[in-house]
């Protein structure tokens, strides 16, 4: 067995053990035990690794799929918990730093804005943006609106009405960003004509848990978004925390893939930048010619400088912040 295979086996074994421990928890609501296990999971998954989750053995694949479902449930409970905590303040937006991972959203949103400006320059100052899968803590929309897109209107969509109610409460005291932020309870599969009104659509990592579901969502967006509109799709190239997105599925969905970014820091989402292709009207979806990879050239795969050492220190600090915030709440 070569060194790379040993590294992959060691990582899969470690994550399998964490999955078993997480699955035994009586609840995934925030608690010291939950926070510690998921912090260990993130610490294990974030460093660059040669593992290819598409080539895992069936048993490991089943473990990975179960782990992603647990991560989704835990993330929802974590965000609901902190959304309620923030809503207790007179102006919740003044206290977003109470959420231990808020800095990750700042970094991810900055990265996405810079990628849009670089690869889709005509869309980096959009008039209207849709965020699909915004959840009870719509930090991404807020950071983009407050720091990068001061004139843009944001429509946030989520399946969960309770999540949208929580999100709405966070903006009640803000007359600037709050006036440009709206929340809608809807399934993306039911959105049609409204999708054509957006210059940019952001697709959250947890929308479409299985690969075939993700591909259906992307094809639906490709059928209804305006020609030239940009798609920003988040996914988990590290594979154990979030579903992965195959760029080929984005191409088949009617988009031109412009760039793929795999961050090497504590941002756990990879990002794909794509643009709705005019070809979809000529050839149709499912023809294999509805979209393509970056104008017939090799798609740029970009990555910020690695700062894993800083990330380990950040994770330790965040574990302490979790404990302190829960005591205060």
UniProtKB/Swiss-Prot annotation:
PANTHER family reported in the protein's UniProt record: NICOTIANAMINE SYNTHASE, NICOTIANAMINE SYNTHASE 3
Stored Pfam families: NAS (PF03059)
Purpose of the protein: Synthesizes nicotianamine, a polyamine that is the first intermediate in the synthesis of the phytosiderophores of the mugineic acid type found in gramineae which serves as a sensor for the physiological iron status within the plant, and/or might be involved in the transport of iron.
Signal sequence region: none
Organism: Hordeum vulgare
SUPFAM superfamilies xrefs: S-adenosyl-L-methionine-dependent methyltransferases
Class of the enzyme per the UniProt entry, highest EC level: transferase
InterPro entries in alphabetical order: Nicotian_synth, SAM-dependent_MTases_sf
Protein name from the UniProt record: Probable nicotianamine synthase 4
Reactions mediated catalytically: 3 S-adenosyl-L-methionine = nicotianamine + 3 S-methyl-5'-thioadenosine + 3 H(+)
EC number from the UniProt entry: 2.5.1.43
Keywords from the UniProt entry: S-adenosyl-L-methionine, Transferase
GO biological process: nicotianamine biosynthetic process
Family: Belongs to the nicotianamine synthase (NAS)-like family.
GO molecular function: nicotianamine synthase activity
């Amino acid at each position: 067995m070569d060194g790379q295979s040993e590294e992959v086996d060691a990582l899969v074994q470690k994550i399998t053990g964490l999955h078993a421990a997480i699955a035994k928890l009586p609840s995934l609501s925030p608690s010291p035990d939950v926070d510690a296990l998921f912090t260990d999971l993130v610490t294990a998954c974030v460093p660059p690794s040669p593992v290819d989750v598409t080539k895992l053995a069936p048993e490991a694949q089943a473990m990975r799929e179960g782990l992603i479902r647990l991560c989704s449930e835990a993330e929802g409970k974590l965000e609901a918990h902190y959304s309620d905590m923030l809503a207790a303040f007179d102006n919740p937006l003044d206290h977003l730093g109470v959420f231990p991972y808020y800095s990750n959203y700042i970094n991810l949103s900055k990265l996405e804005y810079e990628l849009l400006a670089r690869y889709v320059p005509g869309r980096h100052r959009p008039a209207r943006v849709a965020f699909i899968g915004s959840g009870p803590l719509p930090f991404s929309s807020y950071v983009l609106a407050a720091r990068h897109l001061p004139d843009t209107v944001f429509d946030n969509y989520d399946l969960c009405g309770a999540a949208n109610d929580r999100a709405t409460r966070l903006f009640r005291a803000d007359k600037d960003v709050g006036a440009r932020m709206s929340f809608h309870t809807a399934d993306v599969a039911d959105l049609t004509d409204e999708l054509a009104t957006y210059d940019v659509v952001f697709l959250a990592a947890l929308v479409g848990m299985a690969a075939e579901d993700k591909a259906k969502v992307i094809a639906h967006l490709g059928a209804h978004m305006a020609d030239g509109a940009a798609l920003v799709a988040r996914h988990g190239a590290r594979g154990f925390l979030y579903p992965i997105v195959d760029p080929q599925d984005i191409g088949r969905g009617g988009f031109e893939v412009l760039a793929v970014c795999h961050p090497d820091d504590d941002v756990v989402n990879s990002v794909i930048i794509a643009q709705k292709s005019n070809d979809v009207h000529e050839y149709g979806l499912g023809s294999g010619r509805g979209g393509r990879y970056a104008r017939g050239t090799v798609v740029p795969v970009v990555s910020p400088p690695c700062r894993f050492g800083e990330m380990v220190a950040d994770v330790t600090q965040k574990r302490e912040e979790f404990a302190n915030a829960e005591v205060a709440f």
